[in-house]
Amino acid sequence: MKKIKIISFSVAYLILLTPIYASAMHIMEGFLPPLWAAIWSVISLPFIVGGFSKIKKITDESPNMKLLLGLVGAFVFVLSALKLPSVTGSTSHPTGVGLGTIIFGPLPMAVIGLIVLIFQALLLAHGGITTLGANVFSMAIVGPFAGYFIFKAIKDKNRSLAVFLAAMLADLITYIVTSLQLALAHPDAVNGIVGSFTKFMGIFAITQIPLAIGEGILTLIVYNLLVEYQKEGGFNLEKTH
């Protein structure tokens, strides 16, 4: 119990240190046309509903998982609030969704991501409410599902590599989707959607690849700490999804 309290305190401390003047999250308020903002919101809704159902099931079966859910949410909040300016209307930053995906599966991350993004929009002026659906879809839905599939595919062969790749891939896929969302909303005048997508991806790659690698390493460290706590009988990471 002592270890998880130390981890929780460390994450909370980092939240307090998160600069409130940091750039907006993936796509800033008003940067998407209303039609695209609505489309991404509608697409995201079923996953959010499914996520609430999954979280209820997890907490009903194991009430002590509430603390771990809170820790995962704080981890996402901190990492996704650390931003580097990238493309106009967007930024590069870790996503933090890999850890929760590995522990709880992808559906709960839709809810956790939604909550984190709302708090960032309202309290830190990161991103916005109109672009919430798009940001949830890229960071809290597609990213976690991509990370989950790679984790499940190789976890029995090499658990550490699976954790690292899941976190890294969840991060990178998020930015591929974000680039597509921006390209669909703002196609290039000459080369259309493909040209715009290529431009956004090219600029994102400069900062996002190193960030994704770093996130993979950090996620592996935190996961290993939780595994050590699991050995003390705190919870069973294998029965959360």
Curated annotation (Swiss-Prot):
Gene3D superfamilies (alphabetical): 1.10.1760.20
Gene Ontology MF terms: cobalt ion transmembrane transporter activity
Subcellular location: Cell membrane
Parts of the chain that traverse the membrane: 30-50, 67-87, 99-119, 131-151, 160-180, 202-222
Recorded topology in the membrane: Multi-pass membrane protein
GO biological process, one term: cobalamin biosynthetic process
Signal sequence, start to end: 1-24
InterPro entries per UniProt: CbiM, CbiM/NikMN
Swiss-Prot/TrEMBL keywords: Cell membrane, Cobalamin biosynthesis, Cobalt, Cobalt transport, Ion transport, Membrane, Signal, Transmembrane, Transmembrane helix, Transport
GO CC annotations, alphabetized: ATP-binding cassette (ABC) transporter complex
Biochemical pathway: Cofactor biosynthesis; adenosylcobalamin biosynthesis
Its job: Part of the energy-coupling factor (ECF) transporter complex CbiMNOQ involved in cobalt import.
Quaternary structure, from the entry: Forms an energy-coupling factor (ECF) transporter complex composed of an ATP-binding protein (A component, CbiO), a transmembrane protein (T component, CbiQ) and 2 possible substrate-capture proteins (S components, CbiM and CbiN) of unknown stoichimetry.
Family per similarity comment: Belongs to the CbiM family.
HAMAP family, per database record: CbiM
Protein's recorded name: Cobalt transport protein CbiM
Protein's organism: Acetoanaerobium sticklandii (strain ATCC 12662 / DSM 519 / JCM 1433 / CCUG 9281 / NCIMB 10654 / HF)
The organism's taxonomic lineage, starting at the top: Bacteria, Bacillati, Bacillota, Clostridia, Peptostreptococcales
Gene this protein is translated from: cbiM
